[in-house]
């Protein structure tokens, strides 16, 4: 079936092969649609501008609510400690940031980093009535060109947004 099945049995070889293939591709996918690599970011931006106000509801509906369990599990896996600083890449409406902020205490903090202003704004109300408002900052920026220096954060995470990044290696 495969010419060189050894590639698929070795994690490093497999990743190199997949990266090489992705680097040569002129197209990528946005959902099930094939789009030019240089147009994907625009498509992602347009899509999330149009769904931002309903994104959280749609996420709950389409996952039958299980995304709440996935998110709590992801935060536990980070093993955050009070005082840590976390970067939430493609943080959108801030669900993961809110969960994380509860673990960080008053000395810690989370930066929600998302390219889409509409998604950020759609989530601002979720922290307004909680005691974590001063632990979460919002920065509009591109996940492929993060504008923070190395070692600025104790941890970084990306949730569902990873599927919308064209050049994951960046």
Which role fits each region the language model picked out?
Residues 1-45:
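N-terminal auxiliary segments of SAM/dcSAM-dependent transferases
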Residues 39-69:
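Short, contiguous, helix-prone interaction/anchoring segments in small proteins
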Residues 54, 64-84, 99:
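Conserved alpha-helix/loop element of class I SAM-dependent methyltransferases that forms part
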Residues 69, 95, 117-118, 163-166:
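Short alpha-helical
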Residues 85-146:
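Class I SAM-dependent methyltransferase SAM/SAH-binding core
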Residues 144-156:
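A short acidic, Gly/Pro-enriched loop at the edge of an enzyme's catalytic core
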Residues 154-168:
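A short SAM/SAH-binding and catalytic strip from SAM-dependent methyltransferases
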């Amino acid at each position: 079936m495969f010419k060189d099945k050894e590639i698929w049995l070795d994690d490093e070889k497999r990743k190199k092969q997949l990266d090489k293939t992705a680097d040569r591709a002129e197209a990528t996918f946005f959902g099930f649609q094939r789009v030019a690599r240089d147009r994907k970011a625009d498509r992602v931006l347009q899509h999330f501008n149009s769904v931002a106000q309903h994104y959280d509801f749609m996420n709950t509906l389409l996952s039958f609510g299980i995304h709440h369990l996935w998110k709590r599990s992801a935060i536990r896996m980070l093993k955050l400690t009070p005082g840590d600083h976390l970067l939430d890449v493609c943080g959108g409406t801030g669900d993961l940031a809110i969960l994380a902020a509860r673990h960080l205490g008053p000395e810690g903090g989370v930066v929600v980093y998302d390219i889409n202003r509409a998604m950020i704004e759609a989530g601002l109300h979720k922290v307004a009535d909680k005691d974590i408002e001063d632990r979460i900052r919002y920065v509009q920026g591109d996940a492929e060109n993060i504008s923070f220096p190395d070692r600025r954060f104790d941890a970084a995470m990306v949730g569902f947004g990873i599927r919308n990044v064209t050049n994951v290696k960046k």
